[in-house]
Amino acid sequence: MPTILLVEDNEMNRDMLSRRLQRRGYEVVIAVDGREGVEMARAGGYDLILMDMSLPGLDGWDATRRLRADPDRITTPIIALTAHAMAGDRERALEAGCDDYDTKPIELPRLLSKIEALLASTE
C-alpha cells in the first residue's frame, strides 16, 4: 500500500482528501504546516507528497525548495496543490521542485491519475 504524506493546513480539505485517498487503498500521513512537512519528508518512508502551496509560516513553495536542496536530496515525488490557479503557477511549482501540479477544489479522478503516473514512474 503506497504511503502519501499530505501537507495541508485546512482541516476540511485534509479530512476530505485523506478519507478519499484511504478508500482507494493509500495510507495517508498528515502534516499541518510546511515545517512539519519538511521534517516528516526528511524522516522518509513516503512514496509521494501532496503539498499545499498556501501554508502558514513556511509555505509549500519554500518547503519544496528546502526538500529539493537537502544534502540527502529528497527524491520523493511532490504534487503541488493550490487554490490560486494563477498564470505561471504550474511553471513556478515545477521550478520549485514539484513533479506535478493540481488545483483546488480537488477533482479526485484527475489527482488520482497524476498520483498513479508518478508512482508508476518511480517503480
What is each residue range found by the language model?
Residues 8:
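Conserved acidic carboxylate
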